Amino acid sequence: MYRDGKMLGDGLPMNFVLNHGALGDVICSLPAVIAGRKADPFSIIRVWGPSWQHELLEHLLKPYGEFEIRNFEDFPKTKAEREERNLGHTALNQMPFNTHTRNRVHMVDYAFGCLLDARPEGLLERSYPTKAPLGPRRFDEPYVVFPVGSTSENKLFRASVMAPIIKWVNEQGYVPVLVGTKTSHTKAEAGGVLTPITIIDEVDRLPPSLRIECVDLREKTTLLELRDLLGHADAVVGVDGGTLHLAGTTDANIIYAMGATIPQHRFIARNGDPSYKIRYVGPRDLECTGCQSKWRMSRHDFRFCAYKDSACMGLLHPDDFINGLKELGL
């Protein structure tokens, strides 16, 4: 409150434009959106997100107040158009020419800076939105979800790493469930043209004797159905990517592997606790581990390994995943 017990502001609507629209980036932007609603409970707040995430955004934000969810594709791109439509204020969740991909800044903090010109006040404000309910359970059997897709080699869950984990999970009586897609809705510039990012995985390299034990749900779920699947799972096991961030909007156990970054800059906080029902896994004995988190300049694209071998993914050790699952009660 300010003078005379009144809020400071002009009463115009606020437009949060999530043009940095990859699933993980959008989810990491939601704590800032929620903080904006809490700071100003009266103004209209519009959230412009990718159309393929519209239903998910409505569902995740509903417990936190009133928001108008709009499709980013319909957002007026010029200032003249926005003024003509009297849209109000606008903030984007991305800085221009963002090839540094948030090196030493947590993605939630980055979104706070872009959308609110502020930083979060502690871990509770940094926490993912977890209040939205889950839909019905898909399987009666206990199961563990493996997000298998990656947008780059240095985030690829390699078959050599995955296979022993799947084998152990199956031996403990859990059904391994594979999720993912082949083509991302996210686009990146290639040769001056925005094109969809291709998703890669190594499922075909898993031994046939293991593949037959898995339920393959790749390409078979909507985002909300995927969230339900993650939330009801006994655990979600994977490498840094959008599906793990989606799991972070539920109460699921998570094993979160990373190579180019470190937990300090990529942790998932729930209810103010970055260690809640989660274990972080990194490569063993690799000097360049956390390369992105060590880099202090902009303009290097860490989707691509500087050494061109993405060694960090091959040096993830299955035992570290399995020990994490044991610690989480599996």
State where each predicted segment sits.
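Catalytic machinery of carbohydrate-active enzymes
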Residues: 1-330
